[in-house]
């Protein structure tokens, strides 16, 4: 079990707010944590190592040119097959994680990637070039993805209680 949180829209002390939101879900990932914060978005992750036990499996994870940022909870059962397909398209992989398959799959297929996924998952991808946020979860809802729109702010997380620390 891992967990992630995030929000759009610039706020004062975004990194501190994100840290508090992440603390609410610390039980979901005791192995490590990671953050991505810029003027547009804040994304945080709590990790429980399962597939790639190295630090290379840490999140948030980026594509090659760092234009896409991903946080992901779950397991993609067919990630090895998808990885082979993506390598054939020219994608370069730096980890053995299923999360890296998601980010390259989104680059290659966009939202159509969802039709190819087999597993239990929830994830959010931020495109820095377009300022778009794309989130999805498995079709059976095994892995949770909660979200709320509060004014101009979009919040999301693996547990709804993480929203309590956001000022909106």
PLM feature spans:
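Cysteine-centered catalytic environments shared across enzyme families
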Residues: 1-168
């Amino acid at each position: 079990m891992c967990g992630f949180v995030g929000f759009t829209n610039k706020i004062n002390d975004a990194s501190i707010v994100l840290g508090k939101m992440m603390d609410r879900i610390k039980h979901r990932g005791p192995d490590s944590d990671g953050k991505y914060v810029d003027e547009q978005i804040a994304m945080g992750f709590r990790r429980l190592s399962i597939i790639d036990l190295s630090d290379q499996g840490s999140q948030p994870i980026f594509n090659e040119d760092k234009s896409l940022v991903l946080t992901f909870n779950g397991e993609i059962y067919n990630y090895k097959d998808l990885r082979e397909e993506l390598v054939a398209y020219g994608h370069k992989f730096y980890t053995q994680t299923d999360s890296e398959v998601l980010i390259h799959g989104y680059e290659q297929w966009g939202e159509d990637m969802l039709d190819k996924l087999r597993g239990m998952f929830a994830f959010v991808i931020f495109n820095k070039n377009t300022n778009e946020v794309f989130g999805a979860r498995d079709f059976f809802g095994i892995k949770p993805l909660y979200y709320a729109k509060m004014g101009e702010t979009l919040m999301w997380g693996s547990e709804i209680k993480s929203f309590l620390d956001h000022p909106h």
